[in-house]
């Protein structure tokens, strides 16, 4: 496949910056724990906005919805006219002592399922209050970093396979944004009964913590971004955009939402708000010099696949 080397990603989305109103709500109580979400709302005159629901990272054993880096990301999202939501979810691996891989697999399954349940509850809370929160119910996206990205991808996977009962039967996510995520399998065949939402995959090609390819034994394990793209999205002509960070590891879980917000906004614009017949070719992008990736007209829908090279200077900035 042809590779085109470009040099920087700069802003694609130009909107007025809005003042932001941040409010905290309790959206559920489970296992004796109050689950809260922070709502970042643009203070504008629009009655409906797209909405991005975000789950933090931390290996299902640590992390918090209101960490400074997440606040900055969601504030920037809201400044561009998108309601941002950062949620709590129960941490299934917190304080757990794992003795072997079999025990780890069982606890991980419980952890992923709990996180998905909590993300679904947060989305339902947003849907139930869509008028008050000025959210367009048809433009709700989910996102996350690392464990949160697994949660987002898994939530859409479960929804497509009829495993989500808390949301309206005809509900579909408008998009999924994954910062170093994967889909988990716990013994079943990996398949989607309904077409998934458009996905923005960001992943380091050498990520071994949340695999870029797949780590599966007897149908148990993780299917990473590259495996999902090559074996499902490409074969089924499903809409996606991929940013592959060459020779990077799991630091992309943070680099993505800290350094690549313009690409997030580009994805939302092209795939969620204004889907068209644009095909984004397989591109290698370095950090310096160009305003946007090469866009080519296509006939089969909106797809994207970019390979990103980021300088060591950027790596230092995300630490």
List each model region and its residues.
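Short beta-strand element of the alpha/beta-hydrolase
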Residues: 48-59
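Primarily recognizes the serine-hydrolase "nucleophile elbow" in alpha/beta-hydrolase
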Residues: 124-195
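C-terminal catalytic histidine-bearing segment of alpha/beta-hydrolase fold enzymes
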Residues: 234-319
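N-terminal cap/lid segment of alpha/beta-hydrolase-fold proteins
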Residues: 19-47
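Alpha/beta-hydrolase active-site loop
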Residues: 105-131
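Bacterial Sec-dependent N-terminal signal peptides
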Residues: 1-22
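Short amphipathic alpha-helix adjacent to the substrate-entry channel of hydrolases
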Residues: 65-87, 94
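The feature captures the conserved acid-bearing segment of alpha/beta-hydrolase catalytic domains
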Residues: 165-236
């Amino acid at each position: 496949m042809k590779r085109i080397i470009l040099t920087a990603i700069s802003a694609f989305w130009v909107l007025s910056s809005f003042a932001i109103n941040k409010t905290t709500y309790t959206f559920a109580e489970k296992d004796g724990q109050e689950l809260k979400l922070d709502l970042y709302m643009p203070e504008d005159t629009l009655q409906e906005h797209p909405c991005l629901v975000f789950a933090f990272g931390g290996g299902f054993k640590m992390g918090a919805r209101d960490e400074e880096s997440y606040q900055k990301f969601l504030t920037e999202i809201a400044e561009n006219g998108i309601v941002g939501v950062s949620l709590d979810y129960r941490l299934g691996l917190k304080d757990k002592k794992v003795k072997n891989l079999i025990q780890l697999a069982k606890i991980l399954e419980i952890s992923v399922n709990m996180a998905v349940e909590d993300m679904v509850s947060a989305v339902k809370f947003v849907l139930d209050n869509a008028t008050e929160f000025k959210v367009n119910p048809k433009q709700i996206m989910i996102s996350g970093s690392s464990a949160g990205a697994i949660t987002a991808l898994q939530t859409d996977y479960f929804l497509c396979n009829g495993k989500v009962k808390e949301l309206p039967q005809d509900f579909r996510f408008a998009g999924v944004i994954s910062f170093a995520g994967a889909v988990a399998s716990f013994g079943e065949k990996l398949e989607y009964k309904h077409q998934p939402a458009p996905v923005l995959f960001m992943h380091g090609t050498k990520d071994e913590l949340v695999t870029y390819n797949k780590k599966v034994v007897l149908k148990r394990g993780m299917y990473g971004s590259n495996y999902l793209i090559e074996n499902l999205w490409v074969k089924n002509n499903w809409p996606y955009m991929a940013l592959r960070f060459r020779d990077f590891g799991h630091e992309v879980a943070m680099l993505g939402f800290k350094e690549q917000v313009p690409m997030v906004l580009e994805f939302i614009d092209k795939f969620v708000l204004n889907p068209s017949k644009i095909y984004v070719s397989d591109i290698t992008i370095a950090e310096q010099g160009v305003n946007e990736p090469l866009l080519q007209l296509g006939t089969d829908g909106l797809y994207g696949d970019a390979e990103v090279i980021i300088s060591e200077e950027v790596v230092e900035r995300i630490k």
